[in-house]
Regions:
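Phosphate/anion-contacting hairpin/loop surfaces
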Residues: 1-196
Length: 196
């Protein structure tokens, strides 16, 4: 699922999507995409199931400096966002979440947006590809292969945080990890992602 908390929908697009009932026809879907597209940066995909704007909901418990919940969302505590920015970590797009909590001392939490700028290497996708859609002709997609590596030429230079096209991966640099780990233990594990 694509999540772009920094993209705030407004006007007709916001009110139309709030009233929308799913499933819908392909024609209606294309009309909705046309409404949203001008509000979304050109490098970001607009696909069914995507979410825009800050996450809204309820928070419970204590949060470490970085949390992965649900599995496709990365949440940062406010002190982690401040430290990452102070240390000059690049590519951090952190959007404050609109959360309610019973705890009066709940720190502000931020959703980390990872724009899909890199690509997995075609050799690791191989058998995991699906054919293009017969209806809309959209390019093939793939299930995330168990062994994966990035296409070196697609890795954005100078960014410590980015996403992977077609996958819900947040890629962070060693520098990002070192900075966040200074704030104490977290429930996130990191795995090296090679490139070829």
């Amino acid at each position: 699922m694509d999540a772009f908390p920094s993209v705030e929908l407004s006007g007709e697009a916001a009110s139309t999507l709030a009233e929308q009932r799913w499933p819908t026809t392909l024609e209606e879907y294309n009309r909705l995409v046309a409404l949203v597209r001008p509000l979304v940066p050109p490098e970001l995909p607009v696909r069914a199931g995507g979410s825009f704007g800050p996450m809204v909901g309820t928070a419970r418990g204590k949060f470490g400096p970085i949390t992965n919940w649900p599995s496709w969302e990365v949440v940062l505590r406010e002190d982690a966002v401040e430290l990452l920015k102070a240390e000059g970590v690049t590519g951090v797009i952190a959007v404050r979440m609109e959360l309610k909590s019973r705890r009066s001392n709940m720190p502000a939490l931020y959703e980390l947006e990872a724009r899909p700028l890199a690509k997995l290497h075609p050799d690791c996708i191989g058998e995991w590809k699906t054919p293009p859609c017969d209806i809309c002709g959209r390019p093939e997609t793939f299930s995330l292969p168990p062994k994966r590596w990035l296409l070196r030429s697609s890795i954005p230079e100078g960014l410590d945080v980015f996403g992977v096209e077609g996958a819900n991966l947040h890629v962070v640099s060693e520098r990002f990890v070192e900075v966040v780990q200074r704030l104490g233990p977290a429930d996130v594990t990191y795995q090296e992602l090679p490139a070829a």
